[in-house]
From Swiss-Prot:
The lineage of its organism: Bacteria, Pseudomonadati, Pseudomonadota, Betaproteobacteria, Burkholderiales. This is Chaperone protein DnaJ. The J domain is necessary and sufficient to stimulate DnaK ATPase activity. Zinc center 1 plays an important role in the autonomous, DnaK-independent chaperone activity of DnaJ. Zinc center 2 is essential for interaction with DnaK and for DnaJ activity. PANTHER family: CHAPERONE PROTEIN DNAJ, DNAJ HOMOLOG 1, MITOCHONDRIAL-RELATED. It comes from Burkholderia multivorans (strain ATCC 17616 / 249). Keywords: Chaperone, Cytoplasm, DNA replication, Metal-binding, Repeat, Stress response, Zinc, Zinc-finger. Residues 5-70 form the J domain. Zn(2+) 1 binds at C149, C152, C202, C205. It comes from the Bacteria. One of its GO terms (molecular function) is heat shock protein binding.
Length: 376
């Protein structure tokens, strides 16, 4: 089955900003999250689709590749499980400019010897809870990594043999080609810039000199981190070529939708149901916060949809000196499954309200006045 367009999945335009994409993701993730839709396969599939679309469009490099090449430009099969390289397009352009200027993009060498390349960066996608994001979190991750082959000790050659000087470039890693009035230096097509070639490759690493293994890394997630932020682990990307420096590992953070709170920057929002008696008479209600429980007074006559602000009960962001606020949106509950006695009491209450006039229902009065003027 063909994949849907990622912008269509999130319901945003192709020129949508990062904030618009993030807000659309949060809204849909809350709607389709498995915790809110137990045993609902359709919602589960929608959630996976929304998550995949956000992972692609929230990454500027992947979004650019998707915009240009579509789904083929962000093939999830590239890279290892959990971690993905994103040096493919840079490598392609590096070859082009390296051929013209005699130096690969991000590398050095050319005249003095074989090309030296920095290793590609890797990306690891990690999902954490809102509580972990707010308070900080130390954990370990397992990522695929390349290490020196133990059989050939990193040479890439079959034991008992060794790499030989490339006969085409004589160990320089580059060759010169004349085209009319121009002399162009380009990467050697035989040794691909290494300056050597391997007549008998190692059977274990197939001549690469390295093998893939999984390594464990310590990751410290700072308190206040937000969805989509990345943590850089220097030197834990793919190894360099010909002595080049290794790339970096970027741990991209995704925060799971919360059952109670919705985050907006450093602020939190929650929906709070209250009895209609508390709304009418006033009282004190208890609300959850990330630090525990808090209470605040509800004035009498509170209407459904009223928002209360609890200062400092949000999240202290990475670049903030103070914590954000918690916004409690009150929803007045209508009682159900009433007994006959309760129904009689409510009827008496309704009658007393009618006798008291419109002063008991200010919103209804203003609404009826607007309707009346509409038909006049």
């Amino acid at each position: 089955m063909a994949k849907r367009d990622y912008y269509e999945v999130l319901g945003v335009a192709k020129n949508a900003s990062d904030d618009e994409i993030k807000k659309a993701y949060r809204k849909l993730a809350m709607k389709y999250h498995p915790d809110r839709n137990p045993d609902n396969k359709d919602a589960e599939e929608h959630f996976k689709e929304v998550k995949e679309a956000y992972e692609m469009l929230s990454d500027s490099q992947k979004r650019a590749a998707y915009d240009q090449y579509g789904h083929a430009g962000v093939d999830p099969n590239m890279g290892g499980a959990g971690a993905q390289g994103f040096g493919g397009f840079a490598d392609a352009f590096g070859d082009i400019f390296g051929d013209i200027f005699g130096q690969a993009a991000g590398g050095r060498g050319g005249r003095g010897g074989p090309q030296v390349y920095r290793g590609a960066d890797l990306r690891y996608s990690m999902e954490i809870t809102l509580e972990q994001a707010a308070h900080g979190y130390d954990t370990q991750i397992r990522v695929p990594s390349w290490v020196s082959c133990e059989v050939c000790h990193g040479s890439g050659a079959k034991p008992g043999t060794k790499p030989e000087t490339c006969p085409t470039c004589h160990g320089q890693g580059t060759v010169r080609m004349s085209q009319g009035f121009f002399s162009i230096q380009q990467t050697c097509p035989k040794c691909h810039g290494t300056g050597t070639y391997i007549p008998e490759p190692c059977a274990h690493c197939h001549g690469s000199g390295k093998v893939k293994e999984t390594k464990t890394l310590e990751v410290k997630i700072p308190a206040g981190i937000d969805d989509g932020m990345r943590i850089r682990s220097a030197g834990n990307g793919e190894p360099g070529i010909n002595g080049g420096p290794p790339g970096d590992l970027y741990v991209e953070i995704h925060i799971k939708p919360h059952a109670v709170f919705e985050r907006d920057g450093d602020d939190l929002h929650c929906q709070m149901p209250i009895p209609f008696t508390t709304a009418a008479l006033g009282g004190e209600i208890e609300v959850p916060t990330l630090a525990g429980r808090a209470t605040f007074p509800v004035p009498e006559g509170t209407q459904s949809g009223k928002t209360f602000r609890l200062r400092g009960k949000g999240i202290k962001g990475l670049r903030s000196s103070i914590a954000g606020d918690l916004y409690v949106h009150v929803q007045v509950e209508t009682p159900v499954k009433l007994t006959e006695h309760q129904r009689d009491l409510l009827k008496q209450f309704e009658k007393s309200l009618a006798e008291g006039g419109a002063r008991h229902s200010p919103q209804s009065k203003s609404w009826f006045d607007r309707v009346k003027s509409f038909f006049e």
